[in-house]
Amino acid sequence: MAATHLTSTSSLTINTLPSFEGLRSASGISKINVSVAYPSFTSRSFRGLVVRAASITTSKYTSVKPLGDRVLIKTKIVEEKTTSGIFLPTAAQKKPQSGEVVAIGSGKKVGDKKLPVAVKTGAEVVYSKYTGTEIEVDGSSHLIVKEDDIIGILETDDVKDLKPLNDRLLIKVAEVENKTSGGLLLAESSKEKPSFGTVVATGPGVLDEEGNRIPLPVCSGNTVLYSKYAGNDFKGVDGSDYMVLRVSDVMAVLS
């Protein structure tokens, strides 16, 4: 019986895509004759192939019990319109970063100590962007996160009242200059974001290898310099800018 060959060759003409320099297309399209060897698969070989986002899983369940130091949060509903009633396009709708804790795990073991989760069921919390796994429970959006992904507890609608967790700090960002030294007003987009501010609140500290809390080296009232692209930024009710970051992102205390 003659053997069946799984490869074949053919001559292809490939048009290379144009490159872009800024917004100007670089001219020139070249043709390349290529001899290619490829398996002769049928279309049936690709049936059932589904590409999904690896970081997000959405399923429908009626009960979810977090394990270890994980926390189940019922997320706030995305605002689809402004306070004046104008509907926002999907791209302009801000993804919520807060919600209510509805279930917690048993905690984690550090050294010889078994430490409970730092937040309780019913607490209103704020968590880091782009974290956790989304899941639908009883028709509502929920998020499963690790305790360390929770920034702090917020019992009001104003971020200035945030109680940071672990090694995090709440910082009120220094105000940006509205004018140049020559008196010209600066456009909002041209204002350079400052990387220093005043510490408003601190977390209880980091855990050592034995599960004991180590106090943070900064305290409320300190003016600190921090890494430019660190942390999560928030806007207070009065329009003030706030930053929540880890103490390891603080470079110096200013005085």
From Swiss-Prot:
One GO CC annotation: chloroplast
Task performed by this protein: Seems to function only as a co-chaperone, along with cpn60, and in certain cases is essential for the discharge of biologically active proteins from cpn60.
Organism from which the protein derives: Spinacia oleracea (Spinach)
Keyword S-adenosyl-L-methionine: no
Superkingdom assignment: Eukaryota
GO aspect biological process, one term: chaperone cofactor-dependent protein refolding
Record keyword Ribosomal protein present: no
Protein name: 20 kDa chaperonin, chloroplastic
NCBIfam families on file: PRK00364.2-2 (NF001531)
Keywords for the protein's UniProt record, in alphabetical order: Chaperone, Chloroplast, Plastid, Repeat, Transit peptide
Protein family per UniProt: Belongs to the GroES chaperonin family.
Recorded name of the encoding gene: CPN21
Single Gene Ontology MF annotation: metal ion binding
Subcellular location: Plastid, Chloroplast
Residue span of region Cpn-10 domain 2: 157-255
Cited HAMAP family: CH10
Quaternary data: Forms stable complexes with CPN60 in the presence of ATP.
InterPro entries: Chaperonin_GroES, Chaperonin_GroES_sf, Chaprnonin_Cpn10_CS, Cpn20, GroES-like_sf
